[in-house]
Amino acid sequence: MALLKISVVVPEGEVYTGEVKSVVLPGVEGEFGVLYGHSNMITLLQAGVIEIETENQKEHIAINWGYAEVTKERVDILADGAVFIKKGSDDRDDAISRAKKLLEDASSDRLAVSSVLAKIESL
């Protein structure tokens, strides 16, 4: 299976870059998955969790909002704010706390935020 290149960038710099099997993005019309060979598109992203599947594991990045450009070979994400939640890292609990704060500040829609926070807590 061909791998998809992905980059997640915020105003402060790069949060994540790599080659992945797939990525699930929190689009404004709902979550959608991207594999290598996906149709080209540019879309708005809402507060949520980006799910990245690599060869060995799943990784997660919480964002408050942003844009995604999808081509057949890559996904470039420009987000206003993002927190990389890495499994097994020493600062995972701190990352989850920062992700919760980022999402709570992102939207006044309590129901949507609660749903995303529940997803983060299950990681």
Curated annotation (Swiss-Prot):
Gene3D superfamilies: F0F1 ATP synthase delta/epsilon subunit, N-terminal (2.60.15.10)
Chief location category: membrane
Subcellular location(s) of the protein: Cell inner membrane
GO molecular function list: ATP binding; proton-transporting ATP synthase activity, rotational mechanism
Top-rank taxon, per record: Bacteria
Membrane protein topology class: Peripheral membrane protein
One protein family per Pfam: ATP-synt_DE_N
NCBIfam families linked to this entry: ATP_synt_epsi
Family (UniProt): Belongs to the ATPase epsilon chain family.
Summary of subunit composition and partner proteins: F-type ATPases have 2 components, CF(1) - the catalytic core - and CF(0) - the membrane proton channel. CF(1) has five subunits: alpha(3), beta(3), gamma(1), delta(1), epsilon(1). CF(0) has three main subunits: a, b and c.
Protein name: ATP synthase epsilon chain
Source organism of the structure: Helicobacter pylori (strain Shi470)
Gene name for this UniProt entry: atpC
